[in-house]
């Protein structure tokens, strides 16, 4: 059996969970997981080998283990540590922000003083910020989780599969907008305005499935007072628990994902679907849901539907249509593809 180490000591617990889920029951690989406490506390595990780690421990932990491949889930900090790993081992790095991954030193210096200055100075002075692009360059492979972002330089790693559960049977239509409620990521002003001026007679519940705060929370509180009787909204002022997320995603008839075309990471512009993946893509696959995206979003996937002018009619129509997610995204099929890619990375 081939031995893999998966490291996540920074941010993306949901990606670590997806990797753990798809590798569960594999016959050809054993995987050791190295997580920070923050990540470990968010992970649901069975009998996987999970080790508590951080940037000061990880190099010693990897020593003499004989791993065939090391996968680093996020390289957004601890650059000096990760550079040492990529120099010493056969490493694959998951790239989440492609423009950040190739940023020049000058780009990074400019970015340090634009926002979060104290934190970014810490990355510069203590964590090797200027090695960031070198970590990606030195890594044996760069991985992306959205096929549309793959190229000769970036290898697509399929992780998301559709879970087995019964289709939603709601008396009233349930539209879920998954993700943290932030105008930077999705156009919530447009959503609020559309819901407020909706002219549908059909009962409908809109669920904002992510933590709302600041101005967005105030807008939701105001909106909840102005709705017609047939429209309801559900929102959360605290972090959404895994149980609540699961419950509402299963209950959803359709996902509404009006993501912004552009966002920023480390004050560098990233474009959704081109240099940055949206987590809503994985949500749609995992729960087997139609997802309505902005008309300009670059996707060839059949279950990603470009938004039409009358979005509320469109959402209603989609609740009556079927897409066979299990045919294309069942766990056996996705696991097989993932294993083939891992074998290729090991034999490079």
Which functions belong to the PLM regions below?
Residues 219-254:
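Nucleotide-activated donor-binding/catalytic signature segment of Leloir-type glycosyltransferases, i.e.
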């Amino acid at each position: 059996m081939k031995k893999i180490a998966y490291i996540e000591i920074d941010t993306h617990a949901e990606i670590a969970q997806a990797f753990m889920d798809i590798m569960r029951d594999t016959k050809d690989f054993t995987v050791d997981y190295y997580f920070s406490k923050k990540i470990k506390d968010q992970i649901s595990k069975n009998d996987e080998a999970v080790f508590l780690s951080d940037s000061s421990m990880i190099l010693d932990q990897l020593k003499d283990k004989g791993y065939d491949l090391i996968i680093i889930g996020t390289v957004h900090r601890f650059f000096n540590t990760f550079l040492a790993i990529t120099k010493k081992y056969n490493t694959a790095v998951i790239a989440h922000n492609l423009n950040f991954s190739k940023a020049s030193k000058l780009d990074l210096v400019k970015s340090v003083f634009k926002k979060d200055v104290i934190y970014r100075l810490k990355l510069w002075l203590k964590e090797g910020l200027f090695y960031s692009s070198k970590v990606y360059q030195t890594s044996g492979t760069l991985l992306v989780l959205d096929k549309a972002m793959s190229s000769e330089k970036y290898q697509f790693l399929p992780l998301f599969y559709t879970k087995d559960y019964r289709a939603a049977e709601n008396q009233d239509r349930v539209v879920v907008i998954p993700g943290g409620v932030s105008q930077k990521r999705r156009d919530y002003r447009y959503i609020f305005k559309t819901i407020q001026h909706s002219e549908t007679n059909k009962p409908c519940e809109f669920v904002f499935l992510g933590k709302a705060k600041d101005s967005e929370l105030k807008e939701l509180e105001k909106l909840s007072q102005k709705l017609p009787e047939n429209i309801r909204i559900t929102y959360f002022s605290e972090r959404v628990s895994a149980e609540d997320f699961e419950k509402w995603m299963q209950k959803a008839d359709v996902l509404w994902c009006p993501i912004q075309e552009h966002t920023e990471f480390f004050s560098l512009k990233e474009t959704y679907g081109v240099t940055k993946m949206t987590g809503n893509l994985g949500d749609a696959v995992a729960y087997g849901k139609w997802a309505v995206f902005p008309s300009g979003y670059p996707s060839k996937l059949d279950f990603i539907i470009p938004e039409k002018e009358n979005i509320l009619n469109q959402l209603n129509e989609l609740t009556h249509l079927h897409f066979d997610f299990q045919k294309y995204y069942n766990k056996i099929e996705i696991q097989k593809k993932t294993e083939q890619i891992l074998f290729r990375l090991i034999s490079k």
